[in-house]
Amino acid sequence: MIYILGLNGNKMRFDWSEYLNLAQELAATNSDCSGNREAKLRSAISRAYYSTFCLARNYLRDIEKDPRLFRKNRDINEHQYVAKEFIYHPTQLKNMVKIGENLSRLRELRNKADYEDTMFNLQREARTALMLAENIITALSKLTE
């Protein structure tokens, strides 16, 4: 579990939705330097993914009590596992399946942004990543209502 220190020095759990806020700021920032702009858009995609991945993982771990996500030395690819657990969830609720599908799609965008030397339509890809992230977070919040 990751904690940050609050103003009074007490441990606080990190709010992963803050990564989405950062992603939105990065994507909205205009820059005259094209290299800097590209770095911001790529970072926006990456932060959007990690925001939703961590929230989805925590839902499975903390709400669904998934035992595989409690272990320190995991024998799974956590990124694939979390998405597939939503897609193939025993309830097969439409919301659950959509979360998994959107998370997989967002991960593909994140991998391109983090590892590909050239990325086409970066502005559009960043908008898509933010939309997917917002949809995932909305769907996750509906599951906990």
Segments predicted by a language model, with ranges:
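Terminal alpha-helical segments
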Residues: 1-145
